[in-house]
Amino acid sequence: MLAGPAMSQTTPTPDPVLAGYRASIDNIDAALIHILAERFRITKAVGAYKAQTNLPPSDPGREERQIARLRKLAEDANLDPEFSEKFLRFIIEEVIRHHEQAQGTR
C-alpha cells in the first residue's frame, strides 16, 4: 500500500534557536501592549483635562516636537525614522480622536 502525501509528512523538529527568538518577540510584543495601554491611560487623563479647561484636542506644535524627538531617538537606536514617524502619527491621530470624543466634538 502506498502512503499518500498526508501520510508521508512528519512534524518538523522545533528549531530551538528560532523558538528562542520567537519567545523574545512575544515578550517584547506583550511589553509594547502594556506600554501603549499605560500611554493611553495618561492621554485619556490629558483629554479629560483639556475638555474641562476648554483646551483644543490637538496641539500641533507639541506633536511636531514629539515627532522630531522620536525620529532622533529612532536614528540613535538604528530604527528607521520614517517607520517611527508613521507609528507615532498613528498613535497621535488616535489620541486626538479620543480627545475630540471627550469634548463631544466628534
Model region roles, listed by residue range:
Residues 2-106:
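Domain-level signature for soluble enzymes in the chorismate/prephenate branch of the shikimate pathway
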